[in-house]
């Protein structure tokens, strides 16, 4: 009798293990808008393409259909390739940027994202005066690992990037009303918790 119960338990466990897992929710399955729990609305563009743009619906400069033109503070538009080539800037504290990613993603997510091609890029509009990212948008690979992350996730992500990341721009860029920044993030360079542990002294 005990053997029968044991065999039955093993069969039930095997059957449960064999059940296909539920497909991940895709919050960005179609173009349009989605809403975070705090009421923030995000525009979704490219849901049927390899990459999807997710940006705050209030964004003016980094929306999917926004102009890529830049302007001097006096209102003149940059006209030449040479002018655009002189605009330069970079994240001032790369460690702050990396820390946000470490906080936002679990080790399991990082491992999965390391295996994907171009999973995530962060675009932004930067105030050249203080280096603040006043607009942030996300371009994600159309992968379940990223489309299953809720609008609340991207809302928190956006807020932290705006609050904690600053850009250092060159003198030419400081003549502009705003400039654009783009960071294509390489998850293979993002350490896991185990990789952050101190190595034993030799």
Segments from the language model and where they lie:
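Charge-biased low-complexity segments
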Residues: 19-202
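Hydrophobic h-region of N-terminal signal peptides that target proteins for export
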Residues: 9-18
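Positively charged n-region of N-terminal signal peptides that target proteins for export
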Residues: 1-4
